[in-house]
From Swiss-Prot:
Residues 115-144 have a biased composition (Low complexity). This is Homeobox protein OTX1. It comes from Rattus norvegicus. It is found in: Nucleus. GO terms for cellular component: nucleus. Residues 38-97 bind DNA. GO terms for molecular function: DNA-binding transcription activator activity, RNA polymerase II-specific; DNA-binding transcription factor activity, RNA polymerase II-specific; RNA polymerase II cis-regulatory region sequence-specific DNA binding; sequence-specific double-stranded DNA binding.
Amino acid sequence: MMSYLKQPPYGMNGLGLAGPAMDLLHPSVGYPATPRKQRRERTTFTRSQLDVLEALFAKTRYPDIFMREEVALKINLPESRVQVWFKNRRAKCRQQQQSGNGTKSRPVKKKSSPVRESSGSESSGQFTPPAVSSSASSSSSASSASANPAAAAAAGLGGNPVAAASSLSTPTASSIWSPASISPGSAPASVSVPEPLGAPSNASCMQRSVAAGAATAATSYPMSYGQGRSYGQGYPAPSSSYFGGVDCSSYLAPMHSHHHPHQLSPMAPSSMAGHHHHHPHAHHPLSQSSGHHHHHHHHHHHQGYGGSGLAFNSADCLDYKEPAAAAASSAWKLNFNSPDCLDYKDQASWRFQVL
C-alpha cells in the first residue's frame, strides 16, 4: 500500500523499482511507522490469561507454534501476542536468575539465547517490521539505485561514469536502436528499451551527474547520455538510449551549443550532427524522440544530433534551455524537454529528476 500512496511523488517509478524502493526508503527517511498502523496499544493481560500463560511457561519456556496457537485460542489473544509474552517472560526469568546468582545464570543464558533469538526473530515479526522495512529499504534502495536512475543518482553511482557510460553506450546503441526507433513519439516505448539498459543506465545517470561536472569533456557527455537511457523513462528514452557512447560526442557538442549548432566542432563527429540536426530527427530510426524533437527542434535544431547517427535526436529531450550558459559552459544543460521535464538547469549538478 505504502508504495502506491507514495509513488506519485516519486516519478522514478518510471523505472518500476522506484515504487518499492522508495517505499523502503521512506521508513528510514523519517516517518518510520506512520504508513503502518500507529503504535500498537500496550497489551494488558487479565489475571486468567496470565494464569494460562504461566501454566504453559512452567511446562516449556519455548512453546512451539502449535502450543502458542492453542493457548492463544484459550485466552482469546492473537498468537503473536502470546509469542511476545513468552519472549518477555523468558527475558524476565533470565534477569531474575542473573541478579540471583550470576554464575548459574550464565550457562542457562547461553542455552536459552540462541533459541530465544529464533523465537525472538519470529516474534520480531510483530515488532520489527519497521526495523525490517528500514533495513530492507536501505538494501532495496541500494538495489533500486541500480535499477532506478533516480535512486542511482542518490546513490551516486556516478563514480565511474565514463566506464559505465561507455559500456552502456555500446550495447545501448544497438539495443535501443530497434525498439526505440519504433516509437518516435513514445517515451514509454523508449522506456522499455532503456529498461534493459536499466541497471547500467542508472549508473549512467549518476555518471551524468558526474559527467555534468566533466561536462566539458565530450567523453563525459557520452556517458551522461548513457544515463539518459535510464532516463528513458520519462524522456524519450531513445535519446538517452541512443546516446551510444559513440555518438554522444556529437550530441554533446551540439548540446552545448544549441544555439551554436555548429559549435559541434568540439566534436568533430558532431559536425555531422550539426548538419543533420535539423533533419536527423526524421532520419533517425530512433526518431522516437522525434516527436519531442520537434519541439526541441524549434529550440535547438542542432540538437538533433542527427549526425550522431544514433538516433539521438537532440530532441532527445536535451533542451539547452539556457543556450548562453550552455555555450559558455561546455557542460550542457540537458533540459529534458517537456516530456522529460528534467531540466538540468544546473549543469554542474544535474538533478535527475525523474518525473
